[in-house]
Amino acid sequence: MKLTEVIEGKARLVIPDPSEFSREGKFDPAWSPVFYNPRMVFNRDVSVLAVSVISPPSVLDAMSATGVRGIRYVKESGVKGEVLFNDKNPVSVELISKNLELNGITGKVLRSDANSLMHQVKVGYTDLDPFGSPAPYLFSAISSLRRKGVLGVTATDLSALEGKSRTSSKRKYGVQGSRLSYSKEAGLRVLLGKIVKEASVQEKGIRPLMGFYHDYYYRLFVKMEDGAKRADRSLESLGTLYECDRCGYSFMSSDECERKCPVCGGELKYYGPAWIGEFNDLEFLKEMKNRLTEFSYLSNSVKISELLEYLERENRFGPYYRVDVLASRLKVNMPPMNSLLGCLGDAVRTHFDPRGFKSFREFSEILECVKGSSATYETSGR
């Protein structure tokens, strides 16, 4: 197997040469004997910053592949304690050892099934970055965490989480209902809801530190809080997401609601169970922002700063509305987002969708602003 060297952050890595596994001029990381995805660099850059704030005493990189995450946590996040690198692929295990030596760091390299290993260890931070759904690994990942431990998890199975595939949604996440127009946020809330349920079985509650959507995946950092009472409190933050199929009115509720829109009387679509609380901790985001200057060498430092600003602004609001969906329901042209936000006043864009916004204004006022902004746009000649 031919290897090539890449630089990511402060890490030097040898990875399988993509040219050896290309097909008709195209390359998919899944075709390589060891998985390395350059499209996940932003995910890893954010994670390096987040782990520097978490400052765990020990780390498990449960599905290490090349070892890039664990290596970067040592070299960039300042992790001083033991780092466990695990992968069941023997080729990966060999490559991880090479990369540890290349970077001059020590770590324990294991070849084990991730679920089996996570039931045997106790660490301060477990990183779960599976190929596809994290659902089969969540219970054991939570059990691997010591008191007040933190779980970092990536999910790429958007079809199941967002409700595009209702059978997958039900099978993997126990979700009932239909896909909503704010599906990107719904998916993140469903993933958090699944984590709550898996943690509660182990008498643990959760505190979300950071959650976001980017490109084609979700990324979450969730702190565990031991105790049955904390587990019960987290379960109280589960509920159902709703959206009127006629007028577009959306809301979340922990109580079971009539399937009739309180605004127009239309049929309510629903999706859940899902987390209905906040999914970002403002103090955690603030500390990440404060530390970002130390990570100015990252190619994504500006993008990370922008993401943190988005998350901070939108955290206090409920689900977002899509301006194109509301305009379609009103049978008007879609207005410019800036005009709409100016009309609403207390409203923000969302990182989930460039067409999305969040507002505390009454729904009737939101609709009036959509109509008014559209009319102004039309009369101004666009």
Curated annotation (Swiss-Prot):
PANTHER family: N 2 ,N 2 -DIMETHYLGUANOSINE TRNA METHYLTRANSFERASE, TRNA (GUANINE(26)-N(2))-DIMETHYLTRANSFERASE. The lineage of its organism: Archaea, Thermoproteota, Thermoprotei, Sulfolobales, Sulfolobaceae. It catalyses: guanosine(26) in tRNA + 2 S-adenosyl-L-methionine = N(2)-dimethylguanosine(26) in tRNA + 2 S-adenosyl-L-homocysteine + 2 H(+). InterPro entries: SAM-dependent_MTases_sf, Trm1, TRM1_arc_bac, tRNA_met_Trm1_C. Dimethylates a single guanine residue at position 26 of a number of tRNAs using S-adenosyl-L-methionine as donor of the methyl groups. GO terms for biological process: tRNA N2-guanine methylation. This is tRNA (guanine(26)-N(2))-dimethyltransferase. Signal peptide: none annotated. PROSITE patterns: SAM_MT_TRM1. It comes from the Archaea.
